[in-house]
Amino acid sequence: WGACEFCRRGEPTLCVDYHVLGEHVPGVHAEQIAVPEDNLLPVPEGVDWSTAAAAPLVFQTAWRMLIERGDLSAGESVLVLGASGGVGHAAVQIAAHAGCEVFATAGTAEKRAYAAEIGADHTIDYTEDDFARAVRAETGGRGVDVVVDHVGADTWDDSLRALARGGRVLTCGATTGGRPQTNLDRIFWNQLQVIGSTMAAPGTAERA
């Protein structure tokens, strides 16, 4: 890693010169590529190459966001948007494994069934239902402790509406746009936390 204050304390994703292989640095579709050793992980015995190529990105991203940045605890309630996507399905599994009550949104019956299969306690069809209202109905009007929103502008205000007082929204992406309108009254009056997370830090894979 580099020599900035963030790299020195083991947080290279905060470095101003942080780059992602395949996004900022081309060439990762080549059959062979030379990269720094720190960018590599050993493939565990019994894990096929397709799984090894796909799992680290989404599971490390979700783990850092939920556990390391979001400080998720057993017994909390978590709403995961886009639960059938890469980060979404990883977040559902991590939250369930952590002992949380998991709500998940998905757009088809098949995807909702998959979310339930991997750990969601409640599934919501976001194409038919106001997911914030559905969550509040399921929680007796309280809302959830944590919302995982990597969708962005289209869902941001509803994510804030779905939170209980003192809740926190975790974001690692903005598929539908990164400039949502935000109700600041709701954030400060309900004492909500907005927590951003990007990729993973060194050692996240081992901890996860």
Predicted regions and their residues:
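N-terminal Rossmann-like NAD(P) cofactor-binding module of classical short-chain dehydrogenase/reductase
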Residues: 124, 145-148, 170
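Short, glycine/polar-rich helix-capping loops at beta-to-alpha or helix-loop-helix junctions
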Residues: 28, 106-114, 131, 179-184
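Glycine-rich phosphate-binding loop and adjacent beta-alpha segment
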Residues: 98, 106, 154-208
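Glycine-rich phosphate/adenylate-binding loop and adjacent beta-alpha elements
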Residues: 1-40
